[in-house]
Amino acid sequence: MESKLNETFFRQAAQKMLKNKSVFGAVLCVESGDSSISWLGGVGNIKAEDRYFIASVTKLYVTAVLLMLRAENSLTFTDKIFEYFPEELISGIHVLNGVDYTKEITITHLLSNTSGIPDYFYYDKPRGKAVTDLVHGNDQPWPLDKAIQRVKTLKPKFKPGQKGKIHYSDTNYQLLGAIIEKVTGKWIGDVFKEYIFQPFNLKDTYAYQDINDTTPVPMYYKSREIRAPKYMASITAEGGIVSTAKEAMVFLKAFFNGCFFPKEALGELKKNWNMIYFPGQFYFGLGIEKLWTPRIFSPLKPIGEVLGFWGQSGAFAFYNPETDLYFTGTINQASGFGHSAAYKAIIKIIKSV
């Protein structure tokens, strides 16, 4: 494996990501389970050690925290979410065909994106989407109460837990973050620090909070450089962690090697997969994603599972058990047009083993 997966090979794989016209800079980190393979590089306008927004990869950190809180008997995944919120805030968040299903929604429904609750960020409205405002320079915070207020004006996608139904919704993770804060009595950024950042000595990883902090590299939306400090500071559980590819790798390896929860719990996370088609095409389980890798991509040798999480910013963190290879980094393009560059690099490396 090591003879082919060398410095030149990895550098070429990273450079190839820049051939996507939407990608202006990228970071790629690849490691094997035993670290006999370990490569880190930056191309374009991003350096290997740069901090970047990991965006929705943050949700994998939420999964880890929830599993640890469950192990402490602080909560169960079958808990009804209305138990954690004031009635005036949560009531009416899921009204479908005149029936309020709010009290049927569980933590599992949120964690698996099967609640049916609309996504406040991407949902079409006459006045446009929150994401549209953001990329056109209208940076504004979206705290939980504001997100819920918008969601209550929208029609749910389906009943909570309806068989075969799934809808990717950032609202679900806003709610999960609030539940974590309720259980611990702490801001979720401090919970991340206590449960993950400090135990693993992650000195370049933190929950974005200071809107004057310009340390993270700016994201791009198509050719436009965007900075949205107010928004990023308001969505900690949904996508507000800042990290580096190297430190995201430390977390990823810990996640899949039983450092946060027994390795057997991975079976629970992978028990039920549903295909999501927006904001990308991939499978979603219980707080975890799996890349869509049809056999036609590798007819002679199946790719196998590629598990982890995408971020809308182009951040990624994935693990392929078959080759025991881990991948972290970012293509730093929030339009969705650059994700294929990272996907192709990951698949190419796996196929080369």
Segments predicted by a language model, with ranges:
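Catalytic loop of the DD-peptidase/beta-lactamase superfamily, centered on the K-T-G motif
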Residues: 1-42, 49-53, 83, 164-165, ...
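Short active-site loop at a secondary-structure junction
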Residues: 19-25, 44-109, 159-169, 236-239, ...
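Short, charged, amphipathic alpha-helices and their helix-cap/turn boundaries
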Residues: 28, 32-40, 83, 124-160, ...
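Active-site helix/loop module of the DD-peptidase/beta-lactamase fold
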Residues: 56, 71-122, 153, 178, ...
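Well-ordered alpha-helical segments within folded domains of soluble proteins
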Residues: 60-64, 171-177, 246-250
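The feature captures the short pre-catalytic strand/loop hairpin that immediately precedes
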Residues: 148-158, 221-232, 299
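Short, contiguous, well-ordered secondary-structure segments
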Residues: 152-164, 174-183
